[in-house]
Regions:
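Residues at helix-coil transition
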Residues: 49, 174-178, 206
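Beta-strand scaffold of nucleotide-dependent catalytic cores
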Residues: 6-9, 87-90, 118-119
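Short, flexible active-site-adjacent loop segments at beta-strand->alpha-helix junctions, enriched
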Residues: 12-17, 61, 92, 113-115, ...
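Glycine-rich phosphate/pyrophosphate-binding beta-alpha loops
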Residues: 38, 64, 90-97
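A structural signal for well-ordered alpha-helical segments within the folded catalytic domains
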Residues: 34, 38-42, 163-170, 189-196
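C-terminal glycine/acidic-rich active-site capping loop/insertion
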Residues: 75, 80-82, 98, 104-189, ...
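Predominantly a Rossmann-like dinucleotide-binding segment in NAD(P)-dependent oxidoreductases
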Residues: 1-69, 74, 208
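Short arginine-rich
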Residues: 197-207
Length: 217
């Protein structure tokens, strides 16, 4: 491919405090790593086809730590066999009025032959209005400036839903009906691997130690 063998990855994802509060109100034991960074870990393992052998992480203690005992942000370094390294970060620290409707995400992949940089915060599509707009994930929060396309499941327009959730739902229905694995759908093993990595990241953030990650298959 045009990138060649992947040598490093840098990625980050931010939720507003309003979205993070909605998340933790439903799952009191969740963390930025398990709930939010998991998207980055999933993409990382999918893009690279590799699983890390160790995790080192550290986290910030702020509003969410005081109220819920959860870290406000988590930043990690993952090491892989062959020398590949990834730096990932997840934050719940941006204020309620941050213009992303759901999440702000960036993902960069560097290889021997090239690099890819994706800015998935959609800052190129902005709406501003004197009228307040409800956030799609947190409708109780009124926004006057918002980034179109920053709601991860997609957006409603003219009574129809467009975006990733629509495509994933159709793929799931087709897979069940046709008894085949669609290439855009994760497997149970994929989910298990991502959760194992996320738990290792949390363990490192809590202990301050490098956590080895072993794989049996």
């Amino acid at each position: 491919g045009y990138i060649g063998d992947i040598t490093s990855v840098k990625a980050s994802i931010y939720l507003t405090q309003a979205v993070a509060r909605a998340v933790i109100s439903r799952a009191p034991t969740t963390t930025p790593s398990i709930n939010t960074m998991t998207y980055l870990v999933d993409l990382l393992t999918w893009f690279s086809g590799k699983r890390p052998i160790s995790a080192y992480a550290s986290g910030a203690k702020g509003v969410f730590y005081e109220e819920f005992g959860a870290l406000d942000s988590t930043w990690t370094v993952l090491n892989f066999d062959g020398g590949m390294v990834a730096t990932l970060g997840a934050s719940w620290e941006v204020p309620v009025f941050w213009p992303a409707n759901n999440a702000s995400m960036e993902f960069e992949v560097f290889g021997r032959e090239g690099a890819v940089s994706v800015k998935d915060d959609h800052r190129d599509m902005v709406i501003a209005s004197n009228k307040s707009m409800p956030g799609p994930y947190t409708p109780e929060v009124d926004m006057h400036v918002a980034l179109f396309g920053s709601n991860m499941p997609g957006d409603w327009a003219l009574g129809e839903h467009f975006g990733a959730m629509q495509e994933e739902t159709h793929a799931f229905i087709n897979s069940v009906g046709q008894r085949r694995q669609d290439s855009i759908l994760a497997t149970g093993r994929d989910g298990f691997d991502v959760l194992s990595i996320s738990l290792a990241i949390d363990q490192s953030a809590n202990t301050g130690e490098v956590v080895p990650i072993t794989w049996t298959s």
